[in-house]
Structures are given as C-alpha cells and as structure tokens.
C-alpha cells in the first residue's frame, strides 16, 4: 500500500480553491495483459506542494511514477482504468516525450552522468533528436534553474553528487 504525506500544505480554503496540479484518479495498472499491480490508486498533488510516496518494496511506488511519466509501455505495462490529469489535461496514453514537454520528468536513482563529458555535452546528449535552436533555450533554462551548475565546460565527473543529480534532471528536461 502506498502512503502519501503532504509537506507545505496550504490552508484548506486555499487548497480547495486551487485545482490540483496532478491528479491520479482510481488507476489500475496491468503488466503483460494479466498481472494486476495497482488497483484503485488515487492521489492529488496541489500546486506548490510536495507529496512523498512511501511504502515497502513492491508496494507500487515506481509503477505509480512510471504510470504518471508514461513509461509503463517499456515494460509491457499499461494503465487499464482511471485517469491521470496534469495541469487540467488528461495525460495517460500520451507519449513520454510529450509528457516531458508538459513538465513531468522522472529521474531515477543512479544519475548515469558521463563523467568524461562536460555539463553542456551531457545536457545536449539528452536532446540529441532536437535541433540546436530548440535545445539552446532549454539548456539556458537548466543553468538558470540550477545556478550551482555555473561551469558549463567543466567535466561532469568533477561535480558533487548533488550537482550531478541536478545535471541528470536537466538532461531529462532538455
């Protein structure tokens, strides 16, 4: 069973007036067309809050995140019931790259930064299918969002663990 905990919860009156940024409504996830792994899962993430998914191994935390990110198909999984709504728009069934463009990014543990490449090269690697003009603005946004990544041309292997995680998040976004 997945437990959610809200941090920085807004006052009840404010929370009711604001539609949730992310809403997972009664989803069911099935792998290989027969293995039911989630049933009736619902959660809401109000704008400006942090929600933690807590649970034992095998409780469905990663599956929930993969469902939200659109990554279930890579493991023969699918959301067979319910809906996932982000910023007022239903996103289940949408390709993962389009979900990223809408602002949902999943970066798992294990940063997989290429240490012999620069920060800039690592970011460009995440956007290898896109044109330079389109990628440039996204890369600038990453460096603005993470000011600790001020050195674009330094080797990523010399970054701290936290900076490498920032770089991994930026690469997923670019």
Model-found features: residue ranges?
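Short beta-strand immediately N-terminal to the Walker A/P-loop
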Residues: 51-52, 106
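The feature captures the beta-strand-to-loop junction immediately N-terminal to the Walker
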Residues: 54-56
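Helix-to-loop junction immediately C-terminal to a conserved catalytic motif
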Residues: 69
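ABC-type ATPase nucleotide-binding domains, specifically the catalytic core motifs of the NBD
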Residues: 32-33, 51, 72-75, 119-137, ...
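Conserved ABC transporter NBD signature motif
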Residues: 79-89, 102, 135-137
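Conserved ABC nucleotide-binding domain
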Residues: 91-94, 142-158, 174
